[in-house]
Curated annotation (Swiss-Prot):
The lineage of its organism: Bacteria, Pseudomonadati, Pseudomonadota, Gammaproteobacteria, Enterobacterales. Pfam families: Pentapeptide (PF00805). The keyword Ribosomal protein does not apply. PANTHER family: BTB_POZ DOMAIN-CONTAINING PROTEIN KCTD9. Signal peptide: none annotated. InterPro entries: 5peptide_repeat, Pentapeptide-BTB/POZ_domain. Keywords: Plasmid, Repeat. It comes from the Bacteria. Residues 67-106, 107-146, 162-201, 207-246, 247-286 form the Pentapeptide repeat domain. This is Uncharacterized protein in mobD 3'region. SUPFAM superfamilies: Pentapeptide repeat-like (SSF141571).
Length: 295
């Protein structure tokens, strides 16, 4: 890169996490190390200054080097591969935006509008998406460990093969969402709406689904070992070949559930409604106790 007749070069050193900026002309050379995060944030802020027609960089870059895009309109914007780690995007409009491969780790996206957004393979680890609207969003193979999605709207979202370990999805709307082969180990889904959701072959060990609504959900071959499903509504759900070993299903509604060839060994079914369930070939070893089976 040439600026005012000087050749400017940038070198990233992984083990120091620094960027060296070197400026050369015909007579001398100067170099300086910069923290890589501040470097990338500054460059990203310059890009957004042009995109948003902002005159002063300080309007979108804080003194601490954090990108502040709170409440901005970035709908239908191509942000593929953008570096937005720890950025403030709360209340922003990102509907239909392309955020694939973007780094949004630690970002604040609380109450943001992400309807129809494309977030495939983005990094959203430790991000705050509480109350965000992700209706019909594409989160295929997205990294979302420890993310806060409490109260978020993920209806009809594509979360196939997404990584949501230890995520907070309490009271989230996941109705009709596709979570096939996603990893939700140790996640909190208490009170979540998962009606008609696809959880085929999904990893849900130790997950908290207490009080969740899973009516008509597809849980075939799902791994729910040691999951808490107390007071959950599983009516008309498909649990064929699911692993529910050591799961807590106390007071759950299992009316018309298909448990063919499922593993319920050592599961707790105290007070559960088991009316019209299919237990053909089901492993009930150590299950305790049965109740509410009246016809």
């Amino acid at each position: 890169m040439t600026i005012n007749g000087c050749k400017v070069s940038f070198y990233y050193t992984a083990h120091t996490n620094k960027v060296t900026v070197e400026v050369k002309n015909n007579y001398k050379s100067e170099s300086q190390e910069i923290d890589s995060k501040n470097f990338f944030n500054t460059f990203q802020a310059i890009k957004f200054r042009t995109l948003l027609n902002v005159t002063c960089l300080k309007e979108i870059l804080t003194d601490d080097g954090v990108i502040n895009l709170k409440g901005v309109n970035l709908s239908d914007t191509d942000l593929k591969g953008a570096y937005l780690s720890d950025a403030n995007l709360s209340d922003a409009d990102l509907s239909d935006a392309n955020l694939s491969d973007a780094n949004l780790s630690g970002a604040n996206l609380a109450h943001a509008n992400l309807t129809m957004a494309y977030l495939s393979e983005a990094d959203l680890s430790n991000a705050n998406l509480s109350g965000a609207d992700l209706t019909n969003a594409n989160l295929n193979q997205t990294d979302l460990p420890n993310v806060n999605l409490s109260g978020a709207n993920l209806a009809h979202a594509n979360l196939t093969m997404a990584y949501l370990s230890e995520a907070d999805l309490s009271n989230a709307n996941l109705s009709n969402a596709d979570l096939k082969r996603a990893d939700l180990s140790n996640a909190n889904l208490s009170g979540a709406d998962l009606t008609n959701a696809n959880l085929n072959q999904t990893d849900l060990p130790n997950v908290n689904l207490s009080g969740a609504n899973l009516a008509h959900a597809n849980l075939t071959m799902a791994y729910l070992s040691e999951a808490d499903l107390s007071n959950a509504n599983l009516s008309n759900a498909d649990l064929k070949r699911a692993d529910l070993s050591d799961a807590n299903l106390s007071d759950a509604n299992l009316t018309n559930v298909d448990l063919k060839r499922a593993d319920l060994s050592n599961a707790i079914l105290k007070g559960a409604n088991l009316l019209h369930i299919n237990v053909e070939g089901t492993n009930m070893t150590g299950t305790k106790p049965w109740a509410h089976t009246e016809k």
